[in-house]
């Protein structure tokens, strides 16, 4: 095994760690707040569909000898999937499922999946079922079928962040969406690209890019949207204002009991005063 191969494996596990750890800040944030307000449900629906596809693609290409030989005949060795890719895909599916469970347990306000999001996800799942049936019917090779799974994952990676970016824009806030998730995801994307370039340098086979476009696209699209989320969090919506609440410190609270009674009488039932905090406090 060459030095570049060893470095590639090490980088693969590092980016696996970054991408895998990127799921936990959101889960922890939801648990700490006991609500999922500010987290897009369409993003979660797309995400679990994407990781289901990615898990199938990586596992079949890595473990199935027939599919692996079909890949060698078309692209030549090596296959663009390592054990870290399989572990990452399955781990991503499980953690996304846990986050979805949190949406049923914790307060979600009036948030729900959009009809457009449900419609897109339904069409995707129907197409996957049809392609799998065609694979068992020998209409297409299994390499073609699992490549379709990878293209679906690539498509989902392109669209899945749009609902969350729009929700942040609509709320003029990134509250409820963990920035640590974004920073770890960005690091993983950069390292994934670096690993692919090292594999090309080691083997001299540029088909590593064309043979696994989903891995390349996953890195590029993730990096692009991570940059957008970083801009939203640190530049556009640095000081979000929670709607419908006042943030008062102790010096702003009147001490005169009569004034307190007058204030209570003058306030509408919908006005809520909260000392020293904002509802939906930003995850910094």
From Swiss-Prot:
Keywords: Lysosome, Membrane, Repeat, Symport, Transmembrane, Transmembrane helix, Transport. GO terms for molecular function: L-cystine transmembrane transporter activity; symporter activity. It catalyses: L-cystine(out) + H(+)(out) = L-cystine(in) + H(+)(in). GO terms for cellular component: lysosomal membrane; vacuolar membrane. Residues 4-70, 154-208 form the PQ-loop domain. It is found in: Lysosome membrane. It is a multi-pass membrane protein. Cystine/H(+) symporter that mediates export of cystine, the oxidized dimer of cysteine, from lysosomes. This is Cystinosin homolog. The gene is ctns.
């Amino acid at each position: 095994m060459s030095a570049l191969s060893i470095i590639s494996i090490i980088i693969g596990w590092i980016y696996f760690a970054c991408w895998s750890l990127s799921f936990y800040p959101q889960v922890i944030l939801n648990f700490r707040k006991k609500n999922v307000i500010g987290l897009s449900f369409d993003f979660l629906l797309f995400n679990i569909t994407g990781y289901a596809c990615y898990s199938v693609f990586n596992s079949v290409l890595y473990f199935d000898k027939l599919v692996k030989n079909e890949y060698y005949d078309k692209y030549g060795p090596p296959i663009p999937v390592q054990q870290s890719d399989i572990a990452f895909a399955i781990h991503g599916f499980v953690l996304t499922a846990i986050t979805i469970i949190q949406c049923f347990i914790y307060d979600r306000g009036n948030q729900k999946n959009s009809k457009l999001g449900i419609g897109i996800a339904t069409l995707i799942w129907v197409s996957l079922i049809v392609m799998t049936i065609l694979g068992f019917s020998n209409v297409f090779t299994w390499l073609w079928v699992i490549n379709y799974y990878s293209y679906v994952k690539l498509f989902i990676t392109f669209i899945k962040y749009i609902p969350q970016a729009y929700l942040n824009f609509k709320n003029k806030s990134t509250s409820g969406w963990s920035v640590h998730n974004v920073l770890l995801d960005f690091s993983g994307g950069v390292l994934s690209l670096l690993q692919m370039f090292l594999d090309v340098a080691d083997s001299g086979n540029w088909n590593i890019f064309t043979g696994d476009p989903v891995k390349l696209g996953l890195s590029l699209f993730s990096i692009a949207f991570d940059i957008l989320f970083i801009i939203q969090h640190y530049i556009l919506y640095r000081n979000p204002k929670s709607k419908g609440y006042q943030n008062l410190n102790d010096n702003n609270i009147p001490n005169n009991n009569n004034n307190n009674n007058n204030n209570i009488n003058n306030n509408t039932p919908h006005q809520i005063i909260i000392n020293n905090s904002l509802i939906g406090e930003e995850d910094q």
